[in-house]
Amino acid sequence: MSPFSIVLIGFAMSTDAFAAAIGKGAAMRKPQWRDALRAGLIFGCIEAITPVIGWLLGRAASSYVSAYDHWIAFVLLGALGTHMIVAGLRNGPEEAEDAASDTPKRHGVLGLATTGFATSIDAMAVGVSLAFLDVHIGVVAVVVGLCTFSMVTAGVMLGRALGNLIGKRAEMLGGLILVIVGSVILYEHLSGAA
């Protein structure tokens, strides 16, 4: 897998966390940099670990499905991407109410970690699909973690001003990127096999 594809996956995986960070930032009256950095660190660490867990699970099953690995990666990335696009198109009234609230909130480590884990489930599934490709999972984990750290830190700081508008678009963009990466993986395999 090319370095460019790995970076694309890193940013695609961080868009859910970015959308959540915008909501977190919107819930705070005036988020400080330390709040944003703390959220970025928590989300980034969780988002870096989950694809490794998925990769380990995928590696355990890889000998059984190696003839179909490119299709598995395509279907998983395509399904996750489509899900993210559909979720981005939906109008989430609960998220809108949370973002519109003027009540300042502090977000504790447990609350941030719970949200971070919830937004990283897709990264675990991507990790499963990466087990079937020629990729160094350590590099992917670091890239995903750094992308998530950056996106969440920026998301918290942008949250108050921008609200859910950017968050939904970021999720749709991330989904589109996953669909494209999955399609490229399938195309590269099929064109190389032909």
UniProtKB/Swiss-Prot annotation:
Q: Where in the cell is it found?
A: Cell inner membrane
Q: Which Pfam families match?
A: Mntp
**Membrane spanning stretches:** 3-23, 37-57, 69-89, 110-132, 147-167, 172-192
Transmembrane among keywords? yes
From which domain of life does this come? Bacteria
What does the UniProt keyword field contain? Cell inner membrane, Cell membrane, Ion transport, Manganese, Membrane, Transmembrane, Transmembrane helix, Transport
Topology relative to the lipid bilayer, per the entry, is: Multi-pass membrane protein
**To which species is this protein native?**
Xanthomonas euvesicatoria pv. vesicatoria (strain 85-10) (Xanthomonas campestris pv. vesicatoria)
- Care to name a GO molecular-function term for this sequence? manganese ion transmembrane transporter activity
Function as written in the Swiss-Prot or TrEMBL entry = Probably functions as a manganese efflux pump.
Q: Which InterPro entries match?
A: Mntp/YtaF (IPR003810), Put_MntP (IPR022929)
- Under what name is this protein listed? Putative manganese efflux pump MntP
Similarity remark: Belongs to the MntP (TC 9.B.29) family.
- Identify the GO cellular component terms for this protein: plasma membrane
User: What sections of the sequence does the record tag as coiled-coil?
Assistant: none
